[in-house]
Amino acid sequence: MSKQTFTTTFAGKPLVVEVGQVAKQANGATVVRYGESTVLTAAVMSKKMATGDFFPLQVNYEEKMYAAGKFPGGFMKREGRPSTDATLTARLIDRPIRPMFAEGFRNEVQVINTVLSYDENASAPMAAMFGSSLALSISDIPFNGPIAGVQVGYIDGEFIINPDKEQMEASLLELTVAGSKEAINMVESGAKELSEDIMLEALLKGHQAIQELIAFQEQIVAVVGKEKAEVELLQVDADLQADIVAKYNAQLQKAVQVEEKKAREAATEAVKEMVKAEYEERYAEDENLATIMRDVAEILEQMEHAEVRRLITEDKIRPDGRKIDEIRPLDAVVDFLPKVHGSGLFTRGQTQALSVLTLAPMGETQIIDGLAPEYKKSFLHHYNFPQYSVGETGRYGAAGRREIGHGALGERALEQVLPSLEEFPYAIRLVAEVLESNGSSSQASICAGTLALMAGGVPIKAPVAGIAMGLISDGTNYTVLTDIQGLEDHFGDMDFKVAGTREGITALQMDIKIAGITPQILEEALAQAKKARFEILDVIEATIAEPRPELAPTAPKIDTIKIDVDKIKVVIGKGGETIDKIIAETGVKIDIDDEGNVSIYSSDQAAIDRTKEIIAGLVREAKVGEVYHAKVIRIEKFGAFVNLFDKTDALVHISEIAWTRTTNVSDVLEVGEDVDVKVIKIDEKGRVDASMKALIPRPPKPEKKEEKHD
């Protein structure tokens, strides 16, 4: 296929798609140019069905530093593991694409997005999402798209689609919404305490804008789209399914209704093992035993799936016996740990998170050097999910995509209520340790984070709580669930996380397993989430009503002084010699910004005070008219040099020593003598002249005798 180009304008910027020139061996490939951002997307599919029990979709978002005219950092000067932003963007693209493949599709699919040029005012992630959908849509991969996504901002009561960098910085909302022509299927948002009505309107505005992008994709597919390949879907043997359902459905139904998680898991596992043992023995000599046992496992999963959904939609019974809008039992604790700067333990049913606060000097901020201009990040929220939290063994190592994503969601929810750096000049790190999990652990980490911040004396604007909403839908009827647990998340159609204060929403995240959800479902879910959020805030505020007025004794204290910008080099010294000497003497940490703000951190107030004295002395300047208690340091024929303070000296000229004539300076002064002097002049080179006689009353002039005349 020869190169073909398609052009439109979207949100005020040119959107150009090129097909047929590059990556022609992929199943589908596009080059998307949005503004001056360029993203190459290639989609490929394996020829055979994978053996696992899940759909192996991999989406990558690769940031090439040359795209922004930068050299990669580090010794190797080569791109390494994806940045946090790249990982989050890959997840952002994966989530709306995944539901658009058929049930039972098991061929491995990879969608690789490579940023070739970067324009900070034209969203490369949105170009990559568009390119991912289009590459799949024009390929022979059986993808039920297209989908598209947009960013939505909110400034002065107006919604802005795909805002530029300056607009996003001024926006009260940072929303990414994706979906198909029919419905929304992915949401990711941070917001400055906006109401449910505004958030819902933003979602609908975003979905409206998506229609334009989907129509553009459909035009392109009509011209260059390939015929979809016929692939084998995972389908179980119908006779085998009927046999197992008839024999064991009643037993499995009973097991599913056991309320306690571990007991329920044991009961369902016992039924499954009994079924597997029977059929493994029955077909032991069959050459297709592996396929049969795979079908048995899939049938049992489908039976459990169907029963959980039936109980909720028909009987209005949840696996743990709760009502549809009921929250699990809550518990909140502060000061769980000694010595640390703040800690909070939050428990919701069988989900429990411990959050630990650490405060540090601003020098500890994280430097982010990606495609965007380098910046410093002063608030970090890290989320850890050890396998023991679900009673299992597993891999331990660096944080995976899920942990990075959950940490970022908590960070987005909490950063909206943090004080400004002017009010609270600290780097803040929260670490959430999930100790138990039965669903909604990311939201538990937000609640625990609020407790830790308030216990640690961080003056947040308001406490934040989070809740996860679920959905069971048969296409016609639906049920929205409050505070979903693991089983409801696994077998349900939606995981809709909502975090916020009493004033409004600070973060949203929605993932679904169906093609999309309607505005009515969104509105109902937001309303139920608000009610639940207020219930959780009641528990948090009963534990700790407001941030403590003081930091923990172990937290670094801070004091700030202002110096002239031209004195920064004096405090730092050649090669950092002066500031290193101060730190070595006092044991403090010192940060100096480009505007001359000097922040001094230490748990010892005396050390802070001593450091302030030293710095004040270093930057102190002599002023004309001021009097100093000086020390004579050198004597010359023409006068004496005196030290006013620290490294500032002055010349007392011989004529400025006394009102009477001084013949020899050494007759009047000696080295080491203390004298009071007044500064009388500072020249353009900074040289200081001082006077001793200016502090002495001038003697009266002698009266002239009258001459007698003869």
Swiss-Prot record:
UniProt-listed PROSITE patterns: KH_TYPE_1, S1
Region of interest (Disordered), residue spans: 691-710
Pfam families in alphabetical order: KH_1, PNPase, RNase_PH, RNase_PH_C, S1
Catalytic activity: RNA(n+1) + phosphate = RNA(n) + a ribonucleoside 5'-diphosphate
Subcellular location, record wording: Cytoplasm
Keyword Membrane carried by entry: no
Binding-site positions, Mg(2+): 489, 495
EC number from the UniProt entry: 2.7.7.8
Ranges where the KH domain occurs: 556-615
The entry's keywords: Cytoplasm, Magnesium, Metal-binding, Nucleotidyltransferase, RNA-binding, Transferase
GO terms, biological process: mRNA catabolic process; RNA processing
GO molecular function: 3'-5'-RNA exonuclease activity; magnesium ion binding; polyribonucleotide nucleotidyltransferase activity; RNA binding
Keyword presence, Transferase: yes
Listed Basic and acidic residues bias regions: 700-710
Cofactor field: Mg(2+)
GO CC list: cytosol
Domain called S1 motif: residue spans: 625-693
PANTHER family per the UniProt record, alphabetical: POLYRIBONUCLEOTIDE NUCLEOTIDYLTRANSFERASE (PTHR11252), POLYRIBONUCLEOTIDE NUCLEOTIDYLTRANSFERASE 1, MITOCHONDRIAL (PTHR11252:SF0)
Family: Belongs to the polyribonucleotide nucleotidyltransferase family.
Function (record text): Involved in mRNA degradation. Catalyzes the phosphorolysis of single-stranded polyribonucleotides processively in the 3'- to 5'-direction.
Protein's name according to its UniProt entry: Polyribonucleotide nucleotidyltransferase
Organism: Streptococcus pyogenes serotype M18 (strain MGAS8232)
